[in-house]
Every structure is written in structure tokens, then in C-alpha cells.
Amino acid sequence: MISFSFHLLVFILLSLSSFATAQQPYVGISTTDCSVSDNTTSVFGYSCNGLNKTCQAYVIFRSTPSFSTVTSISSLFSVDPSLVSSLNDASPSTSFPSGQQVIIPLTCSCTGDDSQSNITYTIQPNDSYFAIANDTLQGLSTCQALAKQNNVSSQSLFPGMRIVVPIRCACPTAKQINEDGVKYLMSYTVVFEDTIAIISDRFGVETSKTLKANEMSFENSEVFPFTTILIPLVNPPANTNSLIPPPPPPPPQSVSPPPLSPDGRKSKKKTWVYALAGVLGGALVLSVIGAAIFCLSKKKTKTQTQEETGNLDSFMGKKPPMSDQEFDPLDGLSGMVVESLKVYKFHELQSATSDFTSSSSIGGSGYIGKINGDGAMIKKIEGNASEEVNLLSKLNHLNIIRLSGFCFHEGDWYLVYEHASNGSLSEWIHTTKSLLSLTQKLQIALDIATGLNYLHNFADPPYVHRDLNSNNVFLDLEFRAKIGSLGSARSTTEDFVLTKHVEGTRGYLAPEYLEHGLVSTKLDVYAFGVVLLEIVTGKEASELKKEIDEGKAIDEILIHGRLLPEGLTSFVERLVVDCLKKDHLNRPSMDENVMSLSKILAATQNWEESSY
């Protein structure tokens, strides 16, 4: 009996310790020292200890002469400019004064043991990991994290090279959410004259909660410039430049230690009372946890049963009638999705598209329109689209089309995306009136490669697009590419999976997928090779496939392509040939393609400049 009680007590204590999960410790100037390699000091990033592995996070960036506009700052952090404009009460054309704090929204995810948000960055002359981390990004990354992420030394960097920059961010722990109601964490870079109290006041947060979030105390609260702290927020941050700092909080009151008991026997008796109370309290907590797990288990079983029934109906060709009242689309969406996306009313979409008339149609089930004066692309989807909505809400990258909201009406979903004002890539490369320069074409190819690399290596979990083609790539006002149509995307944590359901666009599908149903990231690499060939030749995929099937060599196809200078033909040829190899194991990864295209683009820019 004693042994059982002892083990029960140990189990309770271990269980309760999970509720005291440490927050993120502030480690001071260790993060600014490139010589530090010990990860116990969090030099690679904050720990992945949040309740959710992916969450909405924010960082503060101070405008500089090089990054002073909404557009330039958004481009630096690979986020949508409209989000930056909205958070900072600024118009898209706003230019911030030097030093002004700008709120940047990011999707924070776990990469191994580290919590981070990955962005892409083009190396400038005289750049180093130290300069990028501490100057350009103002301490929001570290030398060590950059070297680890890119597996390249600082000395090997060259202008025009594209690298991945992990931004320091974190997701709230279960303790923060349950005890303090924290929903977001914002990474803030300390500057001279800053103190925890001053920073907390600026964002309307109690100093004690900021100290707690960074495992600090009133006695040990010194902070250093170019280091980051986390600001715990209950609501999304407001425009910091319009906030009026609240009065400073009163100094902490010292708590006197309890007087020692003059009677040792009473003290001992109290100790047993406290121990018993602790055991009973722990048992109560475990009971609550057990009940919660039981309820969730029952709910999951019920959900699985409903899904199996739904799948059977779908297989039999049945589509049960639905109404907005009978089916709540929010049931299939995560809480973060509901908070981050706008749920539109159907009449809003009718008004935006003139009641879905042909004049607003862009082919298939797609439409364009204006909602509150802003351009939008609206896609109608029959059946359940909650999985696609959940996926798109997790992605936050400059080269992935952004989902801004959705609508559910009479059994159909309507997804509302950001408007890519220059339409699809195919409209620009398959017509004789194309005005794209060679540099623009290669930049578009690099954007596509970067977007796929994000899906393959930085999304959590990784995804394979499965239907990449020139119709599914869209161009914004500045002809930067954004990958869309992720309805066929499939998550994969393995090197490959097999499927019996082959889908996609003819001319872009890899041999192993068509023949064996093998799905891997190399499926997207093959499709990317076809798109790259389309970009540099102006020919459609079906025509290119016919030429390749007839035995025409890639170099011969490229020679008859448009605008490609002779000196660069061999480099592009090698890249295309590698991407289109029949054996998927011999194709390059997308991060290798990003590196190759970065070099090709840099060489092309030099060639174009010298030809003027």
C-alpha cells in the first residue's frame, strides 16, 4: 500500500510539473555573439514548447532608410502588404519615418526543437550573417540560426544569393493560455534606454506578465540592446505609434517571509497537512484531465463515424442536402483559423461579383471582384473545403497566394483570396504580346521555386502541391509570383507515400506518379521543370511534352526559345534536365533549385546591365 501511494504521489508530481512548463528564458547578449554555439542559450531560437506547434505571432521592426515603406518592409518579411497596412493604420503607399515601430504579422512554427518563422532574403554586397541578423533584421535572428538553417558559412555568401532567415518567435504555452489568457507572443528587439517596465507600458501589458513570459524577475530584469524579449498579448497588437503609454505601475511590494513556528511539532503537523492537500489537489487535477480526455475521445469517435458515413455517401454519389443552418462549417476549422480569417456573407460576394456574372468570371469556378474597395479572387468549391482552408490559414509566405476569408452557402464553399492583379502566369508566357523581360521571367521562376521550397521544408507539416502548372501561378502588381490552387496539396512527413487517386494537369505529372501513384516532393520538382521550360520558351506544356516524347533534346528546345542569351542556355538546360529526370531520386530538391536560380538570375542581371 505504501509502495502504491509513493508511486501515485510521484506520478501526480510528474503530471503537475507539465503544467509548470517553462516559458522562454531571456538569455541576454548571448544571442548577439556569433562565437556562442551552445544551444542551451537559445541562440538558434526560442524553444518549441507552445501548446500549438503553429500559431499567429508578431514582431516589431523599426523602419530604416532601406526599409521605410509598407511595400519594402512587407517584402523583407515575406508577408502580404495589406496585413501590414491594416495592423499599422497605414495606406499601402505609406512611408514611415526612420525609427518608427512597425508591427509585422508572422506564422510561427516548430522546426525541430526551435520555434521560428522562415523568410527568404537576397544577399547584398558586404553582407554577413552578423550584419543580416543584427543590422538588417535588428536582432530578430542570430548568426547561429542563419548558419544552421542554410548550411553555408558566412564567408561563402555572395550578392544575389537567396537564403532562408529564421525569425525568432514563439507560441504561448498551455500555462500562459490557461492562467493568463495569452493568445499571442510578440518578439520585440530591445533598444538603448529600454526597460521591461517601459516596454510593457508601451504595449499595455503588466510588467509582471512580461517578466514571467521571459523567465525574469523584478530583481533580475536587466535587458540589453539587439536582444529580443517576448511580449504576451491577449489581443492582436494595436498601432504602437498611436498608443498613449499608461502610468508606470507601482513598485513591487516586498513580501515578508512568514514567521517561524515556535513549536516544531506544529510546523511538522502543518507540513503533513500541506502534503496531504497537495496529493488531494493533484488527484483532483488528474480526475479533471481524465474526464476531459474521455470526453474528447468520445467526440473524436463520433466525428470519425460521421466522416466514414460522409465518405460512403460520397462514394455512392450521394450529396445530402445542406443548409447554412443544418451544417456549421466552423466545426471543421481550427480555432486559430476562425480568428484569423473573415467569414463573409453570401450577399457580400454576390455584390462583389455582380451576382457571379460572366463578366467577373476568370474561367472555371473562379471570379474576380471588389470587396470594400479591395480586389479579391473568389473560388467556388463544391463539397467540403475545410481541409484546404485549414492548410491555407497556416501558410504565410510572399510566394503563396493568401486566403483572406471564406463563405459557406447552400452546401458550397466560396474561398476569398488576395487579388493578383496581373492574373495567371500562363496569360503572360503563352501569348505573343508578352512584355516580360528575361530578368522578370527568371525572377518569377525563382519565386515559384522559393514558394515550393517553403511548402516542402518549412511548412508544418510539409506539403506537396501535386498540381503545379502555369495556370496555378499568379502574378501581382510587381510581377512577383504567388502559387495558388492548393486544393490538391497533401501533407507528408515521409520521403514518399502511395496513392490510388492520381490527379493533376496533363503534361505536368511525373512518371512515377502516373505509373505507380508515388507522391513525394520530387513530384513538384518535375512540374517545376515543365513550368520553367514554359517560362523560357513561351510554349505550352502539351506542346513541350510532344516535343520531348518525339526525342527532341532540351537544348534544342531552348535554342528556339525566346530571349535566352547563349551564355546562359547551358545553365538553364542543366536545371531543366535535372528536374525532368525520369528517376525521381535523381532530381534536385527545391532548395537546390532556389540556389541554382539565384545564381542564374544574378548572372542575367549582370548580362542585361552590361548590354546597355
From Swiss-Prot:
Signal peptide: 1-22
Membrane topology of the entry: Single-pass membrane protein
One of the Pfam families matching this protein, by short name: LysM3_LYK4_5
EC number(s) given by UniProt: 2.7.11.1
One GO term of the biological process aspect: cellular response to molecule of bacterial origin
Reactions this protein catalyses: L-seryl-[protein] + ATP = O-phospho-L-seryl-[protein] + ADP + H(+); L-threonyl-[protein] + ATP = O-phospho-L-threonyl-[protein] + ADP + H(+)
Top EC group: transferase
Subunit structure: Homooligomer. Binds to chitin oligosaccharide elicitors.
Protein name as annotated: LysM domain receptor-like kinase 4
Organism in which the protein naturally occurs: Arabidopsis thaliana
Name of the gene: LYK4
